């Protein structure tokens, strides 16, 4: 079952169940203290509650008549790094000074985890993601993203775009926060696939296409079977000595990295598709500022 925050043509924001061709409105007034998407996600039974809240009196809305919004309320966004072999190699190549650190963290018990964004820095479907004006080498990182309740339970999954300034991080690993965390540095959406049973990781494909002036300039594909970390372990490390009272999204690393000679340009378009969830597309903006 998939849930989303959408805006129909009348401009209101509603929570819906997402089908292939349409969406069904959820009537949150049926349950006390249920006002936002996160209230459903953080309930004891998100799937059961969602099914109960589907409004039988509301006609389904064609999917092309709604605008999908970022599926985030007040949660934090965190990210894990170097969880795929391809990412390990790329990070070692970009940073001579920190190459050995990236090599070691790939196999270490403790993963790399960093704070990525708050809700104000997140872009939803169709909204711009940003390249820092002081970066000459930036890429999108398509990531399977966990949705975690305040109790540390995995309640769903979505698509994440971890915008990254590779030259800034490569210059010095201590610059990681500046390479990762800035305005419009993350994309999330279009919906949340509620957690129901075990995922077929090999069948959960992740694809990314980057277009420039209407033409594809990069394509890549991987699947969750290539990931070296388990979701439960990442959540355990995230929540160790670290409460998440408003819940969290956790990007789980990338297995798709464009070649070293590639960088994003202003006006590019990034499309990420994950099987079972959907497609997230964001235009890219890079502005010029006087030094």
Question: Which residues are covered by each model-predicted region?
Answer:
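Short tryptophan-centered beta-strand motifs in secreted/extracellular beta-sheet-rich domains
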Residues: 3, 144, 272
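Generic N-terminal segment detector
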Residues: 1-80, 233, 282-291
């Amino acid at each position: 079952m998939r849930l989303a925050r959408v805006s129909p043509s009348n401009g209101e924001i509603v929570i819906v169940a997402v089908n292939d061709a349409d969406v069904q409105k959820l009537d949150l007034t049926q349950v006390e203290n249920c006002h936002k998407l996160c209230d459903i996600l953080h309930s004891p039974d998100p799937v059961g509650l969602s099914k109960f809240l589907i409004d039988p009196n509301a006609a389904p809305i064609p999917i092309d008549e709604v605008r999908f919004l970022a599926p985030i309320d007040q949660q934090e966004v965190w990210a894990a790094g170097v969880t795929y072999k391809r990412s390990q190699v790329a990070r070692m190549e970009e940073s001579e000074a920190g190459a050995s650190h990236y090599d070691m963290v790939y196999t270490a018990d403790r993963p790399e985890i960093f704070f990525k964004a708050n809700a104000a820095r997140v872009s939803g479907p169709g909204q711009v993601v940003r390249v820092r004006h002081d970066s000459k080498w930036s890429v999108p990182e398509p990531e399977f993203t966990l949705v975690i309740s305040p109790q540390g339970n995995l309640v769903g999954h979505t698509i994440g775009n971890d915008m990254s300034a590779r030259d800034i991080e490569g210059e010095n690993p201590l610059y990681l926060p500046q390479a990762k965390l800035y305005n419009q540095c993350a994309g999330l959406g279009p919906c949340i696939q509620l957690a129901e049973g075990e995922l077929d990781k090999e069948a959960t494909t992740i694809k990314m296409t980057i277009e420039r002036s209407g033409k594809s300039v990069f394509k890549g594909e991987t699947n969750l079977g290539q990931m070296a970390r388990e979701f439960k372990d990442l959540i355990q490390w995230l929540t160790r000595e670290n409460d998440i009272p408003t819940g969290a999204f956790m990007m789980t690393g990338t297995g798709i990295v464009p070649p070293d000679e590639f960088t994003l340009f202003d006006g590019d378009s990034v499309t990420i598709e994950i099987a079972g969830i959907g497609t997230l597309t964001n235009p890219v903006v890079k502005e010029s500022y006087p030094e």
